[in-house]
Amino acid sequence: ACPGPNPGRP
């Protein structure tokens, strides 16, 4: 999960 504006991304 990536932090920031796209937490839903791996």
Curated annotation (Swiss-Prot):
It comes from the Eukaryota. Inhibits the angiotensin-converting enzyme (ACE) (IC(50)=2.03 uM). May act as an indirect hypotensive agent. In vivo, is not toxic and does not induce lesions and microscopic abnormalitie in rat liver. It is found in: Secreted; Nematocyst. GO terms for cellular component: extracellular region; nematocyst. This is Angiotensin-converting enzyme inhibitory peptide. Disulfide bonds: none annotated. One of its GO terms (biological process) is regulation of blood pressure. Keywords: Hypotensive agent, Nematocyst, Secreted. Belongs to the bradykinin-potentiating peptide family. Signal peptide: none annotated.
